[in-house]
Amino acid sequence: MPIITNYNSFAYHFGIQNWSCTQDERGTMYFGNNNGMLVFDGYEWNKFTLPNKGIIRSLLADGNRIYVGSYTDFGYFARNSKGEMTYHSLWPSQYKSHNDEIWNIIKVNGHIYFQSFCSYFDFDGKRVTPYYNSKQLPFWLYQVKGEVYAQLINGGICRLHQGKYQTIIPAKTFHSDNVMGIYSLAQGKTLLITHKQGLFLMEGTKVTPIHTNIDGELAQSLVNRTALLNSHTLILGTIKNGVLAIDLRTFQKVWHYNKTNGLYNNTVLNLYVDKGRNLWVALDNGISLIHTGLPLSVMNMEGIGMVYGMTINNNHMYIATNQSVWQYDMNAQKLTNVLGCEGQNWYVEYLGNQYFVGNNNCIKTVDGTNSASLISDINGSTDLKEYHLFEQHALIEATYTNFRIFHQNNGKWGTPKTISGFTAPIREFEIDNTGVIWAAHMSKGLYRLTLSKDLSHFTHVQYYPSLNKGPEEMFHVMNINGRVVFSYGGGLYTFDDIHKKIVPYNGCGKLSKTGIIASSFIDKSQFWVLNNDGFWLIQSNEQNGQPQTFISNSIFGQEINSYGNAMYVHGNSTYFFLNDGIGKFEGKTISQKVGLYKLYLKEAITKDKDNTVRYLPITHEQEDVTSMGNVFFKLSYPNFNNEKLKFCYTLKGNGQTLCETSNSPVISYNNLGYGDYTFTATVQNLSGEKLGGQIIYKFSYPTPFYLSIWAWIGYAFLLYVGVYTYIRWHTNKIVRRNQKIAAAKLMAQKMKTLEQERIIAEQQKKLLENELELKGKETASMAFDMLALKNSMGGVKEQLLDGVRRGTISTRDVNKILMQMKDKDTDLFWSTFQNNFDLIHKRFFRNLHEKYPELTTNDMKICALLRLNLNTKDIANFTHLSIRGVESVRYRLRKKLGIPTDKSLTDFLIEFE
């Protein structure tokens, strides 16, 4: 049986039902799904929907287009310049729908035919022509020998010619059953497969039924879809019973997958054979991939348990499991349980014409389907190796407690004997080319055991609890190209016979540090190893090993035995130990053929510092692709067999070259510098062969304008202007500072001068004040002197008048004297008095005259005397007026000055300024 991989809706996160499948020129797979279109390259599922969110019933890949059919719509998906899938409808807007749902799309002679159960539509690349005939409704269209054949509903097989159906085979030929597949065979023969009536062969116009060994099974299963796997293998997908393969040379069933033995669902909705000759099965629930293009198969043996060992001899396969031992007749394909081997069995070996089984109870021999225990009181036989050194031939057995040895006697292996000197449970062991036994403890530790020459006891036992400073782990012991190798802590080690110490072993190349736990010899140039990822076929050389083929653990769909050795090589075949089955590999490689598929760039994305995403154009026609400093590339290369492919990336630009190798088709470059870049990518198999060509993608991270040459020129100019401006500003600042200093000095000098002038002015003011004070005193003195003089003159006058009365002087002389005294006195006094008074009292007379121009000179004199606070009597003496006259003058002044009666005239004049 070919191996199978199932994908359910939880794997691809889309609808359950898948109605159709196709593959484009790049090798990418497409599936018509309830929710839209699924796209798969072996690494990633992508999903696309129609504008109406409809079910996609049919698909056809042609060039760069994926034609799709749905309810009352059909068209195609195509990638735009950025790699994004966009839909283009071809549905003729003038066509009146008959509830058409496009179930089938074929291409014949450059025309694309979209077929529903009512009509078909012919698309010649430019125009769509609909065809509808209510009396002839198509059930299915087929491409046969460059022509279109049609199975009509309730009709026969017709040839479609110029829009008309020409009957080739009437419906009664197939008992009104529908034909589900038509294939052109050699020698002009045509194969027809019906829904329930089986297979038919048409030669010319003659149609004859073909009988197979499963005719009844096909009638019950209901054939729904068919595919031609190769020239001699027909695939039938059924409604009720999964997928069957028929050999067209013998018309016998080759294999059959349904839900009971690995297919995810029994209802097949479509079949497709890809470029790698693998079979894709679109199911009513999920998708199954049957790896018919691989040299891998699996023998499903439900209920046998986990396989621990096997051997093949004379087309009989003996299988040791954790439940029993089984014999499988490879010719009759019959499996039989070997009696007496119930329970755990660690190995089965064919040595010296005898079958040995390492059972949990003891070692046993097998004859046919029966076993017999060897005489032994020791439980558990875990490993058995042939010792053929120093002209001695024996078998050495490891048990739960010690080692035992078998010697031949008359061509038969005799009773085992215990090898003394050692006691411990051993899981597996190997014998090196010096006869030393290297044994792995059942749980932990490694032993180096030296045998005596007669093989009866151990002369030296050395124990290695671990090979590094970490925690103790389990050892595995294996033989790689004649050298005993130990696996411990993820690395490989061997014993250096010259330096007598354990050293790292690098004979498996890069795999030497990947946790290898088992190996199996093929020949001097090749061997198998097993690690956590799966099985590796290694091409060995003198110093190193190069992986040639990888088989993933998961590809068989069943658990593998990771306890110890899990491989057996027989001839050109390698068998792998599984749970409830055995995997089989034929040949020496499963690497893809160079050029089978094409490597292409799926997405190119750039992000700025704010994580804003922008998709870059990826078509070759696009030029001047600009990005930001972070670039993300996603490649696509079909890898449906889970091969270990290497993607090699190179980025050149900005004066550096970045190279990286990865198992992932995704790579990102962050914090790139400005400049032009060239990104190249290739994909390689384990042998280093380049697959799918090379991707070359050029892009640039343009220098922003603020860092361009013109910007730098601008910056230089601005710098020049700035420096010039600064120099000017600084120079002006110095000038202004010097000017300020000079001005300050000048100001200080002026202030000093002003201070001196102020001091002089103050001194002058003091002098003036002193002078004014002196003048005031002088004025007051004059007033009082004048008053005293007046009083004296009054006395003189009285004396003169008295002389007149006595006749001593004439009246005329007296009057003359008195008049002279009066005039002289008045002019001199008032001239001096007015000058001094005006100085002391701040222009009193002028201000009084300006404000009260109606005042007379005498009024002004009276005002001055009042300001000096003289009483009426004194004023009368000054003015030669009587007291009543002075009172009259005071009254007139009060009226002229507008002084109210309640205010003192003297106070008013004292306060006047």
What are these regions (language model features)?
Residues 83-109, 115-119, 127-138, 381-382:
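Asp-box/WD-like beta-propeller blade repeats and closely related beta-sheet repeat scaffolds
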Residues 1-23, 35, 50-56, 76, ...:
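Residue-level "micro-hotspots" composed of small/polar
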Residues 34-38, 72-75, 117-121, 153-157, ...:
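Loop/turn residues immediately N-terminal
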Residues 41-44, 79-82, 123-127, 160-164, ...:
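Short loop/turn segments that connect beta-strands within beta-propeller blades
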Residues 636-678, 682-702, 794, 800-808, ...:
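Cytosolic nucleotide-binding catalytic cores of signal-transduction proteins
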Residues 297-301, 724-794, 798:
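Cytosolic signal-transmission helices at domain junctions
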Residues 28-31, 65-68, 111-114, 147-150, ...:
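Conserved beta-propeller blade signature
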Residues 23-26, 61-63, 107-109, 143-145, ...:
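Residue-level detector of Asp-centered blade-edge/turn motifs that repeat once per structural unit
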